[in-house]
A protein has these predicted regions:
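Bacterial N-terminal signal peptides that target proteins for export
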Residues: 1-8
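Predominantly soluble domains enriched in secretory-pathway, periplasmic, or organellar proteins
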Residues: 12, 18-341
């Protein structure tokens, strides 16, 4: 009997190892959206099944329950992203090319007002519900503009040590933001509007996307050198690092599944399993599409959304242009829906 149990145990271990080697995720849908231009951040509102997609000079609003485009917010030049203030029925859109924030009514999708920011190229944007303030992170001026979300007025500017990337909030008075060119994370006090700490993410380099686990007090910072850095946000200590795909610009955390997803522009999505606060393992690298570098997760359906498009062949290398970039094929903008098989 012991021999049979031993053989059975070995068989189960083999099956488990075989299963873990298989891809558990796949592309379920591809949503084509008309229009041309680049893209950046994407935001999911689970309560309405609406996906807010930055796209060129407009913001697309897509219903993932009906698979239909439900609205477009125009005149958002160089749009980077949107942050939702559900308690105020407002959305705040960062417009990089005209240094402004467009404030919209979330029910009607109509513009309420456009506010000029105090920096250059507002990129990532965050509504912080604890303070009811909005923070734009201005990439070319290394600062953050602070807006009172109730009055729609600029109330302050925060100087940062370098180029800010994506921010997250602990919902208790602290904002964490990647500082790309300093290889660090800065901690902002939302009451004093001061930087309290700056923590290195070494060996991570050029951090971009950032996600948060508020239960275990962890930050997930994804970096250009194909690395995810896990940081204790109570102490700033680097807990561990994991290998991810290349060209990353976004990361999402699903607290129910305890999984972290990095969207890699090379055309993969790295899936990381959290075993406990300090232990993580890479489950797989799911094929997506070249250029799918930002991501949002629906924490109810556990599906992931990644914008992408097809590319033309890159032009030949010349002395004047030693690093030519491939252009996007017109009319190919798509949002990938990725889910469990």
């Amino acid at each position: 009997m012991k021999k049979i149990n031993f053989v059975f145990s070995l068989l189960m271990l083999f099956c488990a190892a075989y299963t873990s080697a298989q891809s558990n995720y796949k592309i379920i849908n591809k949503f084509h959206i008309d229009g041309n231009g680049g893209w950046d951040y994407i935001t999911m509102d689970e309560s309405t099944s609406r996906l807010y997609i930055s796209h060129g000079n407009e913001l697309n609003v897509f219903d993932v329950a009906t698979n239909k485009l439900v609205g477009t917010i125009p005149d958002t030049k160089g749009v980077h992203g949107i942050s939702l203030a559900k308690d105020l029925n407002k959305g705040f859109i960062s417009n990089g090319r005209d240094t402004s924030v467009t404030i919209i009514d979330l029910k009607t999708l109509k513009t309420i007002v456009k506010v000029k920011v105090t920096g250059n190229n507002p990129d990532a944007i965050l509504y912080e519900p604890y303070s009811q303030k909005v923070f734009t992170f201005n990439g070319r001026s290394s600062n953050s503009t602070v807006i009172d979300a109730k009055t729609n007025k600029v109330i302050g500017t925060i100087k940062l040590s370098g180029k800010p990337e994506f921010p997250v909030s602990d919902l208790k008075g602290k904002i964490f933001v990647n500082i790309e060119d300093e290889n660090s994370i800065s901690v902002i006090n939302v009451n004093t509007l001061k930087v309290e700490h700056t923590w290195p993410v070494a060996p991570g380099e050029s951090p971009s996307g950032l996600a948060i686990d508020r239960i275990n007090h962890r930050l997930f910072s994804v970096c250009e050198n194909k690395m995810m850095v896990v940081v204790d946000y109570l102490t700033g200590k680097v807990i561990t690092t994991l290998k991810i795909g290349g060209g990353v610009d976004g990361v999402s955390f699903d607290p129910e599944l305890k999984r972290v997803y990095s969207s890699n522009g090379e055309g993969t999505m790295t899936v990381v399993q959290q075993k406990n606060a300090n232990t993580y393992t890479v489950l797989e690298n799911v094929p997506t599409q070249k250029g799918a570098r930002t991501i949002a997760v629906n924490t109810i359906t556990h599906r992931l959304y990644l914008p992408a498009a097809e590319y033309n062949d890159a032009p030949a290398v010349t002395a004047e242009n030693p690093h030519p970039r491939a252009s996007v094929k017109l009319g190919t903008f798509t949002v990938l829906e990725v889910g469990l098989k």
